[in-house]
Each structure stands twice: as structure tokens, then as C-alpha cells.
From Swiss-Prot:
InterPro entries: Dihydropteroate_synth-like_sf, IspG_bac, IspG_bac-typ, NO2/SO3_Rdtase_4Fe4S_sf. SUPFAM superfamilies: Dihydropteroate synthetase-like, Nitrite and sulphite reductase 4Fe-4S domain-like. Belongs to the IspG family. Pathway: Isoprenoid biosynthesis; isopentenyl diphosphate biosynthesis via DXP pathway; isopentenyl diphosphate from 1-deoxy-D-xylulose 5-phosphate: step 5/6. It catalyses: (2E)-4-hydroxy-3-methylbut-2-enyl diphosphate + oxidized [flavodoxin] + H2O + 2 H(+) = 2-C-methyl-D-erythritol 2,4-cyclic diphosphate + reduced [flavodoxin]. The keyword Transmembrane does not apply. The keyword Iron-sulfur applies. Binds 1 [4Fe-4S] cluster. Gene3D superfamilies: Dihydropteroate synthase-like (3.20.20.20), Sulfite Reductase Hemoprotein, domain 1 (3.30.413.10). This is 4-hydroxy-3-methylbut-2-en-1-yl diphosphate synthase (flavodoxin). Its cofactor is [4Fe-4S] cluster. HAMAP family: IspG.
Length: 372
């Protein structure tokens, strides 16, 4: 295995979104948001289940109308993952979905209404033991803050967040997390840094409206990576103008890259050159698709020649080093076998699945021994 990153997590309080612990050292939760019409119950349920299959810990659902609130009730009955209801403008919708076993309420201080309306939402959340996310966004700051600062700034986002944190404090409500999102990486990062120094509540990370699948993933990896490497963040969402399933995949890829949380296979692959002895790119692309169901954490290196292949294989769970007609297969740093280059994908898939089963069984035995 590669060296573990010495990231010290920021200390934060613990809340629960459904059965998912957030903060106080809990694994960083990866979430996404549906992009279906919430009133289309079947489509929304299908999308949530697709997100569950790729590992989503939490899913947010927009609830813009009372009709959507009624649909939310039906959706909640058909899925297992905790659901966050995303509420804007009408506080009464928050009160309605609270009746339907919602796991968390996301409210935007910039548009939810006056303090009395916020108090009503908080009182309801307290009575039903529902946590709240205060979701500050650079694109929807309160009018007085827009006038005061002229444009979104880290100080403006911080002031908006602290205004509503203080309000919840006055109401003796501490079951909440906070986000200060912006589409600009530096604005978002600095806003989170300032907020992390002011409060000890869990922080939900995100670069909002980051862009399409490629550009959005890059922006999110930079912004979230900076914050996570500093120990900031308890949950995250990668916001992409793409299939929400991709948000979960990219989120876990970011966490895997920082060695904060492992899920599934971490592929290490060379970009290829004329020295490659087999089709590295085709092999990696095929295996990523074929092995999406594997959740066992492992490093798999796929290197096309002997320049860097042996070195990467030494620190990988499984590693392939390109050779003439046959390539060397390493397991836990030890050379074990040779694989035919012409049948690399099928052979390597079989070996990876077998290794995953072996690791799963070893972990199961370890758990049983601890329980005894």
C-alpha cells in the first residue's frame, strides 16, 4: 500500500442524517442531488436507487411545491438512503416534509423568510429530531449583504452563515451543519476556511454550479481537495451538470486520492507511450466499468512497461507490469504469475474479483474475532 496521508481532521460536533453520522471524526459522507422532477415519483426513486448502488451516503431532493412535498412522502417510502429535503422560499414546505420522515432539512437563509419563519422550522425540526443544513450560496445572499459588500466575498458568505448560526444558537438548536458554497474555487475555499475558525459544527463542502462533467470535476477536485487536505469538511457534494451518479464517483475519487476514505478500486495507470506492451487505456477503461460493483478498497496498478511497473506493483494490492507477449502480475508486492497480453482484461478482472473476495473474507474473520 502507498503511504497514508497525515491529514488531521478538524474537530467538529456530531449530528446524524438518518443513520449516517456526520462530524466528530465520522467518515466523510458523499452525497448527491436528484435532477428529476420530484413529482415524477418513479423517475426520482429510480435515480435515488442508482445513487445508492454507487455508494451515495445521503441524497438531496428538491421540494419546490406542496405537490412535490406529497411526492416526497411516496419517494421516502421506497428508498433506504437518508434524504435531505431542499427548501427555498416557502417555509411551509419544510413543515410539511417534516411530517414525512425527512432525514434533514436544507434551508437557504437568503430566501427562506424572516426570523419568525425560521423559528417555526427550527421548532418543528427539534420536535421531530431532524437536523438542518444552513446552506449559504454566493448566488443568493441576503439583499443587505449584497448592498454592504457589493459582490460575494468570503466575508459576506461568512457573515450570512454566522447570522443564522447565531439565530439557531439563540433558539438552543445545535443539530445542524453549514455550507458556504460558491462557483469560484478561491471564494469558496476562503469562505470555508473563515467559517471553520468560527464554529465547531460539521461543514458540508461543495463548489456550487461547478460546470460539466470534466470542468466541474476539476474545479471540485481542486477546491474540495484543498479544504480536505487541511482537515476541513465532514460531508461533500460534487456539483456537476451531468448524471448525478457521476457526482458520487468523483466524490469518492477525491477522497481516495487523498486517502481519507476508501471505497472500491483505486486504479493506478500510466498514460502510455510507445513502450507499452498491451493496451493499457482500453484495459483500464474496461475494468473501471466491469468492476463498479466492487466496493472492497484496493490499489490496482496497470503499467504498460518495466520502467515504472515493478515499482508501482510493489506498493499495490495487485499490479501488472507490461512485458513481451506476457505481463507480470504482482500480488501484495510479490510477483506471482504472467498474464497473456491478448486476454488481459478478462484475466485481470478474474484476479481482481478473487482478491476482493479474499480481502472481504479476511475482514469478516477479523470482525468475528473482535466480537468474540
Amino acid at each position: 500500500m502507498h503511504n497514508q496521508a497525515p491529514i488531521q481532521r478538524r474537530k467538529s460536533t456530531r449530528i446524524y442524517v438518518g443513520n449516517v453520522p456526520i462530524g466528530d471524526g465520522a467518515p466523510i459522507a458523499v452525497q448527491s442531488m436528484t435532477n428529476t422532477r420530484t413529482t415524477d415519483v418513479e423517475a426520482t426513486v429510480n435515480q435515488i436507487k442508482a445513487l445508492e448502488r454507487v455508494g451515495a451516503d445521503i441524497v438531496r431532493v428538491s421540494v419546490p411545491t406542496m405537490d412535490a412535498a406529497e411526492a416526497f412522502k411516496l419517494i421516502k417510502q421506497q428508498v433506504n438512503v437518508p434524504l435531505v429535503a431542499d427548501i427555498h422560499f416557502d417555509y411551509r414546505i419544510a413543515l410539511k416534509v417534516a411530517e414525512y420522515d425527512v432525514d434533514c432539512l436544507r434551508i437557504n437563509p437568503g430566501n427562506i423568510g424572516n426570523e419568525e419563519r425560521i423559528r417555526m422550522v427550527v421548532d418543528c425540526a427539534r420536535d421531530k429530531n431532524i437536523p438542518i443544513r444552513i446552506g449559504v450560496n454566493a448566488g443568493s445572499l441576503e439583499k443587505d449583504l449584497q448592498e454592504k459588500y457589493g459582490e460575494p466575498t468570503p466575508q459576506a458568505l461568512l457573515e450570512s452563515a454566522m447570522r443564522h448560526v447565531d439565530h439557531l444558537d439563540r433558539l438552543n438548536f445545535d443539530q445542524f451543519k453549514v455550507s458556504v458554497k460558491a462557483s469560484d474555487v478561491f471564494l469558496a475555499v476562503e469562505s470555508y476556511r473563515l467559517l471553520a475558525k468560527q464554529i465547531d459544527q460539521p461543514l458540508h463542502l461543495g463548489i456550487t454550479e461547478a460546470g460539466g462533467a470534466r470542468s466541474g470535476a476539476v474545479k471540485s477536485a481542486i477546491g474540495l481537495g484543498l479544504l480536505l487536505s487541511e482537515g476541513i469538511g465532514d460531508t461533500l457534494r460534487v456539483s456537476l451538470a451531468a448524471d448525478p451518479v457521476e457526482e458520487i464517483k468523483v466524490g469518492f475519487d477525491i477522497l481516495k486520492s487523498l486517502r481519507i476514505r476508501a471505497r472500491g478500486i483505486n486504479f493506478i495507470a500510466c498514460p502510455t507511450c510507445s513502450r507499452q506492451e498491451f493496451d493499457v487505456i482500453g484495459t483500464v477503461n474496461a475494468l473501471e466499468q466491469r468492476l463498479e460493483d466492487i466496493i472492497t478498497p484496493m490499489d490496482v496498478s496497470i503499467i504498460g512497461c518495466v520502467v515504472n511497473g515493478p515499482g508501482e506493483a510493489l506498493v499495490s494490492t495487485l499490479g501488472v507490469t507490461g512485458g513481451n507477449k506476457k505481463s507480470g502480475l504482482y500480488e501484495d508486492g510479490v510477483r506471482k504469475d504472467r498474464l497473456d497480453n491478448d486476454d488481459m482484461i478478462a484475466q485481470l478482472e478474474s484476479r481482481i474479483r478473487a482478491k476482493a473476495s479474499q480481502l472481504d473474507e479476511a475482514r469478516r474473520i477479523d470482525v468475528l474475532q473482535v466480537e468474540k
